[in-house]
């Protein structure tokens, strides 16, 4: 840059600083780049698929999927992990369906959890914004976007048409709270439902509710699906779950993770550690027997997972080894942010 341009830039920066305050414009090379802080999802495979070890703080995250696919369970697992780190969490229950007993079984400290059951969509989003601006909340879950009913729709007749009302509400709210979320370093998770588009001939007919604004404002979008049942004999005790990272602004997207959700217990983390340990060479498998550091830990996956549950120190060491190996390479954030947009509802078969 020649001297005249340098002087012009310095004058412009000085004027901006006087008018808008110090730090309104910064040169990125003047500051050390810090890793994006993350909160674990409670699933080791999903943390690895997300690229930074969990969901990013100071960002908006959308989790969507069919009914009974594990959306609320996953968010409650995130809250449980955040509370273990001393975080303060809030749950905006627009569906009025939160079960405190079930949340407690998943490890959530329900006594410390802030819960709101708003009457209208405007009230829910205003409460969310006020909690964010308090700078005292670390995680907020909104369950769900489909239940954020505009006040005009609630006060109107059952057959009244309110075209685009919810989409406009979401667009306005997200414009308002995005900056506050970044300043407060708060993770805000929106749970969303799936609807079918009429008359789609090619491509997926699936779409999410609440318009397109959330798709743009979300830094991470997760598509969660139930792929099968977990059985003990003839009894179904859980569900096989697949989560695809269909959008990721903080790491490369389109990775996926598969894990089990056990009814009344949540994500089967110890089972995941056994599978990932075998896959990456930390756990030896010989026939039905599993061994770790040369010592047998159990016959069959269930017994080996029980051994990890009974020996939390060994489980923590194994988890750290897996995380250190699979999360050492720093993601190319700039490349991820500048990647060309794609159809986020497409099926992407890329295993971790």
Swiss-Prot record:
One GO CC term on file: cytosol
Regions crossing the membrane: none
Keywords per UniProt: ATP-binding, Cytoplasm, DNA damage, DNA recombination, DNA repair, DNA-binding, Nucleotide-binding, SOS response
Subcellular location: Cytoplasm
Pfam families named in the record: RecA, RecA_C
Keyword Translocase part of the UniProt annotation: no
InterPro entries hit by this protein: AAA+_ATPase, DNA_recomb/repair_RecA, DNA_recomb/repair_RecA_CS, P-loop_NTPase, RecA-like_C, RecA-like_N, RecA_ATP-bd, RecA_C_sf
Binding positions (ATP): 65-72
GO MF terms held by the record: ATP binding; ATP hydrolysis activity; ATP-dependent DNA damage sensor activity; damaged DNA binding; single-stranded DNA binding
Family to which the UniProt record says this protein belongs: Belongs to the RecA family.
Function: Can catalyze the hydrolysis of ATP in the presence of single-stranded DNA, the ATP-dependent uptake of single-stranded DNA by duplex DNA, and the ATP-dependent hybridization of homologous single-stranded DNAs. It interacts with LexA causing its activation and leading to its autocatalytic cleavage. Plays a functional role in the DNA rearrangement associated with the phenotypic switching from a pathogenic smooth to a nonpathogenic rough form in this bacterium.
Name listed for the protein in its UniProt record: Protein RecA
Organism whose genome encodes this protein: Pseudomonas tolaasii
Organism placement in taxonomy: Bacteria, Pseudomonadati, Pseudomonadota, Gammaproteobacteria, Pseudomonadales
